[in-house]
């Protein structure tokens, strides 16, 4: 995994955790949780690609990995839409920058997961 991506995830998660969005803080906490889950999934998928010999054990151990992959893409799409929505409604420049960076990171991670999954298929 690219060290810039790791620091980007950590930076965005730290920034999001500092935001105070009033009644929508539960939604923000949900986004943070999904971001963390997405990072872990992307990392594990990347590790499986690095150990291409592990492909068969991945498929045997988890016969539903394609279903999980589909679910992760749905989560990414939801997060992208949620971040875009937040970006449209916020007037705070700190939040705008954070959400713009989060959106860029989500698009990069989506592409990485697609690349990893094609290598595993």
Swiss-Prot record:
<keyword id="KW-0945">Host-virus interaction</keyword>
<dbReference type="GO" id="GO:0042025">
    <property type="term" value="C:host cell nucleus"/>
</dbReference>
<comment type="function">
    <text>Mediates the nuclear export of encapsidated genomic RNAs (ribonucleoproteins, RNPs). Acts as an adapter between viral RNPs complexes and the nuclear export machinery of the cell. Possesses no intrinsic RNA-binding activity, but includes a C-terminal M1-binding domain. This domain is believed to allow recognition of RNPs bound to the protein M1.</text>
</comment>
<comment type="similarity">
    <text>Belongs to the influenza viruses NEP family.</text>
</comment>
<dbReference type="GO" id="GO:0044423">
    <property type="term" value="C:virion component"/>
</dbReference>
<keyword id="KW-0946">Virion</keyword>
<dbReference type="InterPro" id="IPR000968">
    <property type="entry name" value="Flu_NS2"/>
</dbReference>
<feature type="short sequence motif" description="Nuclear export signal">
    <location>
        <begin position="12"/>
        <end position="21"/>
    </location>
</feature>
<keyword id="KW-0813">Transport</keyword>
<comment type="subunit">
    <text>Interacts with protein M1. May interact with host nucleoporin RAB/HRB and exportin XPO1/CRM1.</text>
</comment>
<dbReference type="Pfam" id="PF00601">
    <property type="entry name" value="Flu_NS2"/>
</dbReference>
<dbReference type="GO" id="GO:0039675">
    <property type="term" value="P:exit of virus from host cell nucleus through nuclear pore"/>
</dbReference>
<keyword id="KW-1048">Host nucleus</keyword>
<protein>
    <recommendedName>
        <fullName>Nuclear export protein</fullName>
    </recommendedName>
</protein>
<feature type="short sequence motif" description="Nuclear export signal">
    <location>
        <begin position="85"/>
        <end position="94"/>
    </location>
</feature>
């Amino acid at each position: 995994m690219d060290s810039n991506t790791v620091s980007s995830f950590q930076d965005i998660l730290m920034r999001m955790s500092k935001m105070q969005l009033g009644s929508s803080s539960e939604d923000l906490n949900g986004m943070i949780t999904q971001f963390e889950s997405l990072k872990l999934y992307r990392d594990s998928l990347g590790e499986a690609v690095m150990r291409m010999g592990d492909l068969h054990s991945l498929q045997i151990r988890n016969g539903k990995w394609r279903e999980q992959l589909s679910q992760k893409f749905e989560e990414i799409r939801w997060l992208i839409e949620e971040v875009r929505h937040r970006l449209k409604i916020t007037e705070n420049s700190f939040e705008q920058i954070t959400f713009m960076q989060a959106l860029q990171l989500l698009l990069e991670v989506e592409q990485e997961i697609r690349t990893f999954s094609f290598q595993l298929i």
